[in-house]
Amino acid sequence: GAIAARRATVLTEFGAEVMVVAPAAGDSVRELAEAGRLVWKRHAFCEQDLEALNRSFLVIAATSDRAVNDHIVQLCHERHIPVNHAGDQTQCDFQFPAIVRNDPVVIGVNAGGKDHGLVKRVAAELREWMA
């Protein structure tokens, strides 16, 4: 979905090796995959993905199915892999900040998952100030 696409895009911009597991994806994921900037496994998350999960530094559970996200979180916790559950902040081991960039400066804005509106406003003001 849109959340996973945004996060995958940001991670690739910072040089991360990204794998997206999803039967369908938006234009940004498709374009990144075609450019070789991420790997796109075109299927729903399944047991065959456990091998890749075991090699992961971190995982983002951002499917449209809460039960699948919950299952991914459980699998990650069993393997001591930090995980972000896009639909449930209480199951997140880490959070994604709003990114404000004006090379060479990069600023991350986060409110601990408590006030996304505030984060958006602060990030917008920083972008305007840095322009």
What function would you assign to each model-found segment?
Residues G1-A131:
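Adenine nucleotide-associated cytosolic modules
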